[in-house]
Amino acid sequence: MLTADDKKLLAQLWEKVAGHQDEFGNEALQRMFVTYPQTKTYFPHFDLHPGSEQVRSHGKKVAAALGNAVKSLDNISQALSELSNLHAYNLRVDPANFKLLSQCFQVVLAVHLGKDYTPEMHAAFDKFLSAVAAVLAEKYR
């Protein structure tokens, strides 16, 4: 459960991400495909080469969904309900992959934000990403 301090840190973090979220989403996906190549199986129709417009577009969607969830910290489940349905019923993505993408997004933030990505912010974002992954996986049960 996110505390009031976590929510404050997440708002501060997303202010730092604003303006770069599309780039960060793209980098997180690219990093995931390199680090965890098995995740490519969910994107057979995508050009997965670096700089691919399809990956860039999907990264933009990932970052937008995270931004939407940051704005809805008191009801992440409702904010991501449609995405949860899509991933569970249509795309049938293994929920373990949400954690892989979360790790990659964390690395991208650490690389780009450096010292501005404090340990406290990292911990709050980790809790947030765990909540997002749980919401995206809740329809699988």
Swiss-Prot record:
InterPro entries: Globin, Globin-like_sf, Globin/Proto, Hemoglobin_a-typ, Hemoglobin_oxygen_transport, Hemoglobin_zeta. PROSITE patterns: GLOBIN. GO terms for molecular function: haptoglobin binding; heme binding; iron ion binding; organic acid binding; oxygen binding; oxygen carrier activity; peroxidase activity. Heme b binds at residues 58, 87. GO terms for cellular component: blood microparticle; haptoglobin-hemoglobin complex; hemoglobin complex. Red blood cells. SUPFAM superfamilies: Globin-like (SSF46458). Keywords: Heme, Iron, Metal-binding, Oxygen transport, Transport. GO terms for biological process: hydrogen peroxide catabolic process. Pfam families: Globin (PF00042). Residues 1-141 form the Globin domain. The keyword Transport applies. Transmembrane segments: none annotated. Heterotetramer of two alpha-D chains and two beta chains. Belongs to the globin family. Involved in oxygen transport from the lung to the various peripheral tissues. This is Hemoglobin subunit alpha-D. It comes from Anser anser anser (Western greylag goose).
